[in-house]
Regions:
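A conserved FAD-binding loop/helix module that cradles the flavin
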Residues: 433-460
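FAD-site-proximal beta/loop scaffold in flavoenzymes
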Residues: 248-279, 363-437
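Glycine-rich dinucleotide-binding loop and its adjacent helix/turn
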Residues: 119-135, 192-214, 239-301, 407-418, ...
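Ferredoxin-type iron-sulfur electron-transfer modules in oxidoreductases and energy-metabolism complexes
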Residues: 17-35, 56-89, 106-133, 262-263
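Rossmann-like dinucleotide-binding cores of NAD(P)H-dependent redox enzymes
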Residues: 163-166, 170-201, 205-207, 295-341
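Local cysteine-cluster metal-coordination motifs and their immediate loop/turn environment
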Residues: 38-57, 82-105
């Protein structure tokens, strides 16, 4: 065994998976996981833990995997993470734990994410669940939103003895995990639903179809329903658009709507009653993980798909693995290209998109080189569908109906990043509702910090 090289992970063949919604990555078996775990040198000053937003004790759980003690490995992980099977699949490990791995300075870093996934999947298959709190403390906390921030906050509070109720606006719990991430990357019934069941097994209650700010307000939850504190983890579901001519044409979608139709409403299923446009030639504007998800979904629905991104490949914000998979599956990358107008016929249906070539100039405030238009380089792409994947912002419904809850100019809730405390007493917030669209694991980290903040607040009362 070459300790500098990772144990390869089995995947569906690219041609085969491009025509189905089954999970792409097949994961490790026990023997492969133990062999990969044996590459870990068990650093005393583990940088990988510092790179993890929820501070999983990575060397300890990997040591248990190496020794074949998978249940103990799961116990270690579940002390820090409420959603290990999710994180093992969708976290950007290359810029977090694996990016800090000492092995990676000379050779391949340890496949921490794949090992976490293996442990979580093994625990699920063997009926192992996290340990609930020994007793309740009599205090009630409301959690708004059942995405990664809300589930993490709720799970941690339940372990501390709080009576926690999650209020979810949609008809199904999971937030972005169910409506935003495709089945081929994150299976819903086999993975997400089981993770939610684990959170519920801690004593967490989930009420769906409750739109906080409309069905009930935060003030009513605290003053009339008897909740001692509230955590807002409602995410950022309001899509952004470019503001170019033609964006109101038929068959221009936000990635948020397009993926929700497919993921939550199962529009990819021929028996589903939820319609979705089966475009023949689709452009997805954007370069993040959501853009890759939308593009790979459209591909599976039979389209020729183009990613249109105004910067170069080096600046793509999507995970390296997602870009690699998209390329393998046949998605075309039109880089250094920016849309300037969406074209349509006399009935308002998309016929194409006028674009202009870009080149990279000086770095902007983000540190990435600023894209600059190349004069006279305009051209037209013939298309029948355009999907805009330009990020999302929080829906202002909650903040606009809650007195004393301040937001910034982007309508994000202002909260202390260390404990989630907002400008309204007893109300905490975290995840995309505070930061704008970000990653699952960062939302989980915020939920974890807020749970600690809420516990400190209520313990002092």
């Amino acid at each position: 065994m070459d300790v500098l090289k990772r144990i390869p992970v089995r995947e569906q063949d690219a041609k085969e998976r491009a025509t189905n919604f089954k999970e792409v990555c097949l994961g490790y078996n026990k023997e492969e996981a133990m062999e990969e775990a044996s590459r870990c040198i068990n650093c005393k000053n583990a940088q990988c833990v510092k790179g993890c937003p929820v501070a999983i004790q990575i060397p300890q759980f990997i040591e248990q995997v190496k020794n074949g003690n998978i249940e103990e490995a799961y116990r270690i992980i579940s002390e820090s993470s409420a959603l290990p099977a999710v994180c093992g699949r969708v976290c950007p490990q290359e810029s977090q734990c694996e990016g800090k791995c000492i092995r990676g300075f000379k050779g391949d870093p340890i496949s921490i994410g794949k090992l976490e996934r293996f442990v979580a999947d093994w625990a699920r298959e063997n009926g192992i669940k996290p340990t609930p709190a020994a007793q309740k403390n009599g205090k009630k906390v409301a959690v708004i939103g059942s995405g990664p921030a809300g589930l993490t906050c709720a799970g941690d509070l339940a372990k501390m003895g709080y009576d926690v109720t999650i209020f979810e606006a949609l008809h199904e719990a999971g937030g972005v995990l169910v409506y935003g991430i495709p089945e081929f990357r994150l299976p819903k019934s086999g993975v997400v639903a089981k993770e939610i069941e684990n959170v519920k097994s801690l004593g967490v209650h989930i009420e769906t179809n409750v739109v906080v700010g409309k069905s009930v307000t935060i003030d009513q939850l605290m003053d009339e329903e008897g909740f001692h504190a509230v955590f807002i983890g409602s995410g950022a579901g309001l899509p952004k658009f470019m503001g170019i001519p033609g964006e109101n044409a038929n068959c221009v979608f936000s990635a948020n709507e397009y993926l929700t139709r497919s993921n939550l409403m199962k529009a990819f299923d021929p028996d589903s009653r939820t319609p979705i446009m089966h475009g023949k030639k689709v452009a997805v504007v954007g370069g993040g993980n959501v853009a890759m998800d939308a593009a790979r979904t459209a591909l599976r629905l039979g389209a020729e798909v183009h990613i249109v991104y105004r910067r170069s490949e080096e600046e793509l914000p999507a995970r390296v693995e997602e870009v690699h998979h998209a390329k393998e599956e046949g998605i075309i990358f039109d880089l250094l290209t920016n849309p300037i107008e969406i074209l349509s016929d006399d009935k308002g249906w998309v016929t194409g998109m006028k674009c202009i070539r870009m080149e990279l100039g000086e770095p902007d405030e983000s540190g990435r080189r600023r894209p600059v238009e190349v004069p006279g380089s305009e051209f037209v792409m013939e298309l029948d569908t355009v999907i805009m994947s330009l990020g999302t912002s929080p829906n202002p419904l909650i903040s606009s109906t809650t007195k004393g809850l301040d937001t910034n100019k982007w309508k994000c809730i202002i909260a202390d990043e260390n404990n989630g405390k907002t400008t309204k007493e007893g109300v905490y917030a975290g995840g995309d509702a505070v930061t704008g669209a970000a990653t699952v694991i960062l939302a989980m980290g915020a939920g974890k910090a807020a749970a600690k903040g809420i516990d400190e607040y209520l313990s002092a009362k």
